[in-house]
Amino acid sequence: VLRGPGAGGVTYADLESAATVVLVGLEPEDEAGMIFLRLRKASRARGTRVVSIAPYASRGLAKMSGQLIRTAPGDETAAIDSLLGHADYGIDATSVILVGERLATVPGALTAAARLAAKTGARLAWVPRRAGDRGAVEAGCLPNLLPGGRPVADAAARVDVGADWGVDVPETPGRDADGIVAALRSGELGGLVIGGVDPDDTTDPAATRAAIEAASFV
C-alpha cells in the first residue's frame, strides 16, 4: 500500500484534491511545513477534511480547520481501526492517510494504517522526520554526490551536469562537515552557509564555533 510518486503514490497535488486526509503520528506544521501549507490551502479552498489521531488538538490542526480524534499515546492502533466504516470521517478511495515516524513506536499501528488503506482504497504515505534531507541528497548536497543523487566519480554524470550548468565539473569530491570546519579555520574558505545545525551536534563543537567565528561571511 505504501507507494511513492513514481508508482502512483501521494503528491502535493493529491493532498490538495483529497476529500479527507488522516494524520497519524504526524504534526505537519512542526514536522513537514510544505504538507501543512498544502493542507491548510485545501481546507480553505476546497473544504478538505483533515482528521488527526493525536492526544490533543494542535494549533496547526486548528489552522487547517481539522477534526481531532483524541487518542492517548499508545492507543493509536485502536483509533485507526475505529475509522473503518465510520461515515462521519468519509474515508474512501478519495482519501489520503499520512503516517508520521512516531507511529512506528506503537505496536500494530503501522499494520492498522496499512489495513485501513487496503480496505478503504485510500492512499498511504510515510512522512519521516527531516524528510527534507532526502531533497538535499537529490540536490547534491553531499560531498560525493551531484544533483540527482549521482556520484561525482561518475564521468557521464559529470558531463550531464556540466552541460546543464555550462561548466566543467571536477571529479574531486567536495568537503564534508569536518572538512568545511577545517577549511574555515585555516582561511581556505571565507564564507559559510549554515542552517538547522547546532554546533553541539557536530563532532567537535568547539572547533565548529571557532570556524563560524573565523568566517568572513555567514
Outline where the language-model segments fall:
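Extended redox/cofactor-interaction regions of prokaryotic respiratory oxidoreductases
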Residues: 1-38, 42, 46-90, 103, ...
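Conserved strand-helix element at the start of the C-terminal RecA-like helicase core
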Residues: 97
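A glycine-rich, charged low-complexity "G-patch/RS-like" nucleic-acid-interacting patch
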Residues: 92-94
